[in-house]
């Protein structure tokens, strides 16, 4: 106070004021400080000082022709004196006003196109709804979030090539645009930005915003999709939150959301297939999301979710080194352990063989609704600090941590037998057995864990076995914190391997992911997901399986027919018949298959009994492993629409109805396609590649005249040769057999020769 009073006295004397305002600054250190380097040391002061001058702006000399010397009020707009050290003109701020009012105008058509992301943001905010403000403690955790709504997902390198091609097309150096998305975007942008007068650097900068995903590691307490992150500063503070509903969605958020749903569906489906890994790859390669190939999205999209990462691992892509257990992402922050197989007894005296982690380790656990720090030793939980949105979320985290710690208390709390199975009816591994057991009911676990008195630590409270908070007691080693645990920030990706059961391991052999970790949550995808793979037919229910199976047979009838007569085993093993098996009552599968295969063999053996419609109808039943039995069936049952429906072996039924007049097949009333050949001419098989009574000699030979249709062949004399047009427009040379005895074997050799002749 004394000093301030003294200074006030000093300032009241006029001499002091004069010294401070008039004296020149000639101390070398001060001059040096403010004049060395290009960096402005006091920008605010500099701006004030410059703007106080009459002509603070310099401009190119051409300005003298474009702007009058004085404005309407007679104020001078520019000075004739040159700027010291350059040949530019000194200009008044009034010149800027004049230029804005009277200067040349330009077309604004390109502005919404170039500044698209800004225009869209304004629209989203205009249509968004801001709700009430709530004051409460915010548990924020840092997460890697997308801060740039409405972008494509190109890599920085791909985007750079696109930008160069669009903005500077004549620059040296050939830019190779490879991906489909690159080519599409380049074409679209070139058309949009024709005759654009906006500075190329600005266009390039704005294009980058549109093409590349930008992520930041930010504290978030609510939604993490980019349309929420762009208003983060409006929706959450340290002790308040404002409700907000975005006024529009952006494609990048929709892609992320739909990718997760597609990946989960595919992993779930692959798990129950005979070869999960190859099935998963087949599905990823044949699926499209919003019209873009799923494999292209997986290569570019950095979304980290269990199912998505399993798909990436299968494609040989790198993924994050953290691992997943019980839906939480674990990252070891210190310590180390060795794994040892050990047999332990549960509270129910069941023996479990588990891989015990020996040693002290610390982990961070991050889930959607709760986070935690876990310190553990060999089969012992030392400390767990957990924070979450609500009681339920905190309980979930505690259960996962207790199971993961392999603590003796947890093992002893098991009541009843552990026999959980996965979708493919295989027993889960012991750790997941334990997890499922306690997720179903954790009462005994919490009751048996033990409680301890707690010290009063700022920001921490205890939690009792019934999950209520307490300031005196807590579950042994467990505390609830107000602060969240940050997500693992590194974007480092590691090389991983995947086995045929979709277990993903790092290079040290630690399991990072397995199908058990894939969430069962069902959602509705924002973008259309098109699964072309037969394995996904069942996603829309049993009816869709039935219709799709028969549609597939009809679409591929030409090749199916040849295989049916030549190589039935290969045909029966086709994966397209796999989904159908789930519709056939389990007890009947083998019997039906044996019956149908026998029937088909009789058709092959006895000339003239080839019945197209019947083969199509019964073929899917022959795919199951056959049981030898003498049983005959007049109808076969399939489970659709929640009950057993009959397919008649001979004749039509509501399930399978062939209309001879229109040659169209309807399955459960849905059109399944048309048969191109007339089933009545079964043995002739107008389009058939099986030419009975003829020998295929090889490729077309022009000396034998123009190609005949199969019908014209009957006019040939024995031993005569002719070119003939078969199935898919291929022409081959044939000879009519001299004797009829070997007709039966023709069909076998015909197809083999056909293949050779055509290829």
Swiss-Prot record:
Record protein name field: Polymerase basic protein 2
Pfam families found in the cross-reference section: Flu_PB2_1st, Flu_PB2_2nd, Flu_PB2_3rd, Flu_PB2_4th, Flu_PB2_5th, Flu_PB2_6th, Flu_PB2_7th
Motif Nuclear localization signal in this chain: 736-739
Residues marked Avian adaptation (site): 627
GO BP annotations, alphabetical order: 7-methylguanosine mRNA capping; cap snatching; DNA-templated transcription; symbiont-mediated suppression of host gene expression; symbiont-mediated suppression of host mRNA transcription via inhibition of RNA polymerase II activity; viral RNA genome replication
The keyword Metal-binding belongs to this UniProt entry's keyword annotation: no
Assembly and interaction partners: Influenza RNA polymerase is composed of three subunits: PB1, PB2 and PA. Interacts (via N-terminus) with PB1 (via C-terminus). Interacts with nucleoprotein NP (via N-terminus).
Family: Belongs to the influenza viruses PB2 family.
Recorded GO CC terms: host cell nucleus; virion component
GO molecular function: RNA binding; RNA-directed RNA polymerase activity
Function: Plays an essential role in transcription initiation and cap-stealing mechanism, in which cellular capped pre-mRNAs are used to generate primers for viral transcription. Recognizes and binds the 7-methylguanosine-containing cap of the target pre-RNA which is subsequently cleaved after 10-13 nucleotides by the viral protein PA. Plays a role in the initiation of the viral genome replication and modulates the activity of the ribonucleoprotein (RNP) complex.
Key words, A-Z: Cap snatching, Eukaryotic host gene expression shutoff by virus, Eukaryotic host transcription shutoff by virus, Host gene expression shutoff by virus, Host nucleus, Host-virus interaction, Inhibition of host RNA polymerase II by virus, mRNA capping, mRNA processing, Viral transcription, Virion
Localization, UniProt: Virion; Host nucleus
């Amino acid at each position: 106070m004394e000093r301030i009073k003294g200074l006030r006295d000093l300032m009241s004397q006029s001499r002091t004021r004069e010294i401070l305002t008039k004296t020149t600054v000639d101390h070398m250190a001060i001059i040096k400080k403010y004049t060395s380097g290009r960096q402005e040391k006091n920008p605010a002061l500099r701006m004030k000082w410059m703007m106080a001058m009459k002509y603070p702006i310099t401009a190119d000399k051409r300005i003298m022709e474009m702007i009058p010397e004085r404005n309407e009020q007679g104020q001078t707009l520019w000075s004739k004196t040159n700027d010291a050290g350059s040949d530019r003109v000194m200009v008044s701020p009034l010149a800027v006003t004049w230029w804005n009012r009277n200067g040349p105008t330009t077309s604004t058509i390109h502005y919404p196109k170039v500044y698209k992301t800004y225009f869209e943001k304004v629209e989203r905010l205009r249509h968004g709804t801001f709700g009430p403000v709530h004051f409460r403690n915010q548990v924020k955790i840092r997460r890697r979030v997308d801060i740039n709504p409405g972008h494509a997902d190109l890599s920085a390198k791909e985007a750079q090539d696109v930008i160069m091609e669009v903005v500077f097309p004549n620059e040296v150096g050939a830019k190779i645009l490879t991906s489909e998305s690159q080519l599409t975007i380049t074409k679209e942008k070139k058309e949009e930005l024709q005759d654009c007068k906006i500075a190329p650097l600005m266009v390039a900068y704005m294009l980058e915003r549109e093409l590349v995903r930008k992520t930041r590691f930010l504290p978030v307490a609510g939604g993490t999709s980019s349309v929420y992150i762009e208003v983060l500063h409006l929706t959450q503070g340290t002790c308040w939150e404002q409700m907000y509903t975005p006024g529009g969605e952006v494609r990048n958020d929709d892609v992320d959301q739909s990718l997760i749903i597609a990946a989960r569906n595919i992993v779930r489906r692959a798990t129950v297939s005979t070869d999960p890994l190859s099935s998963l790859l087949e599905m990823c390669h044949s699926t499209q999301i919003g019209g873009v190939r799923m494999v292209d999205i997986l290569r570019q999209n950095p979304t980290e979710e269990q199912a998505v990462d399993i798909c990436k691992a299968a494609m040989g892509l790198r993924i994050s080194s953290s691992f997943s257990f019980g839906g939480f992402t674990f990252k070891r922050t210190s310590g180390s352990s060795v794994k040892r197989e050990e047999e332990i007894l549960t509270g129910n005296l069941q023996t479990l063989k588990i891989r015990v982690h020996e040693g002290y380790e610390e982990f961070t656990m991050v889930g959607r609704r709760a986070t935690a720090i876990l310190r553990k030793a060999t089969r012992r939980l030392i400390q767990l600090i957990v924070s979450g949105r609500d009681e339920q979320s905190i309980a979930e985290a505690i259960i996962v941590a207790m199971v993961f710690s392999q603590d003796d208390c947890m093992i002893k709390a098991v009541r009843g037998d552990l026999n959980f199975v996965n979708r493919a009816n295989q027993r889960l591994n012991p750790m997941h057995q334990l997890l499922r057991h306690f997720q179903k009911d954790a009462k005994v676990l919490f009751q048996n864990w033990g409680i301890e008195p707690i010290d009063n630590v700022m920001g921490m409270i205890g939690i009792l076995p019934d999950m209520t908070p307490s300031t005196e007691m807590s579950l042994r080693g467990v505390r609830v914190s107000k602060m969240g645990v940050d997500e693992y920030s590194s974007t480092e990706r590691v090389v991983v391997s995947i086995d045929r059961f979709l277990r993903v391991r790092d290079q040290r052999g630690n399991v990072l992911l397995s199908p058990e970790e894939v969430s069962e949550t069902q959602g509705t995808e924002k973008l259309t997901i098109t699964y072309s793979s037969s394995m996904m037919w069942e996603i829309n229910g049993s009816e869709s399986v039935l219709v799709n199976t028969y549609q597939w047979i009809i679409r591929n009838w030409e090749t199916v027919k040849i295989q049916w007569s030549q190589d039935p085993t290969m045909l029966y093993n086709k994966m397209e018949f796999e989904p159908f098996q789930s519709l056939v009552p389990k007890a009947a599968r083998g019997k039906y298959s044996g019956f149908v295969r026998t029937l088909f063999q009789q058709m092959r053996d006895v000339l003239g009994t080839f019945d197209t419609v019947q083969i199509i109808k019964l073929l899917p039943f022959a795919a199951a492993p056959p049981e030898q039995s003498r049983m005959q069936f007049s109808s076969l049952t399939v489970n659709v629409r929640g009950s057993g429906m009959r397919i008649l072996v001979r004749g039509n039924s509501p399930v399978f109805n062939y209309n001879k007049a229109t040659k169209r097949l309807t399955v459960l009333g849905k059109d399944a396609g048309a048969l191109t050949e007339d089933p009545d001419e079964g043995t002739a098989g107008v389009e058939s590649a099986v030419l009975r009574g003829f020998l295929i000699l090889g490729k077309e030979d022009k000396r034998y005249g123009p190609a005949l249709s199969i019908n014209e062949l009957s006019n040939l004399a024995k031993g005569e040769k002719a070119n003939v047009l078969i199935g898919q427009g291929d022409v081959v040379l044939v000879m009519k057999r001299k004797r009829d005895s070997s007709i039966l074997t023709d069909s076998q050799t015909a197809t083999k020769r056909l293949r050779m002749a055509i290829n």
